[in-house]
Amino acid sequence: MSLRDRLQTALKEAMKAKAAARLSTLRLINAAIKDREIANRGEPGAADVTDADIMALMSKMVKQRHESARAYAEGGRLELAEKETDEILVIEEFLPRQLTGDEVEAAVVDAIAASGAASIRDMGKVMAVLKGKYTGQMDFGAVGPAVKARLG
């Protein structure tokens, strides 16, 4: 079952269960997917939105909500921070499990070995191996410094 189908099924279940917060979050995800489809229509040779595109979109949504929740908590708006946290939980249901720090470190070591990287100049090769194998399972912005440290 594709990710889009899973989202549609969850949306229908949320409607039947009258789960307003969950329904709202699922509708936000669908709206973001539709926005991406519309943006892709204008590009020549652009394909439909794939599961990988949807995962990247949802990962971005999770990051945005983490930032918002932190800002709300710092501002004393705990009810809004809690709402953002609830949305994160709903979105993460559809994302692959995130790797732990130790697993990320092991993946970096394996990717360096697989790509034959010897210096910092080979960082792109290592990141390409990681992105091919672990899309949606790790934050590549945070992995970059770990790869740099290993190669440098």
Where are these regions (language model features)?
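Charged, compositionally biased, marginally structured helical/coil segments
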Residues: M1-G152
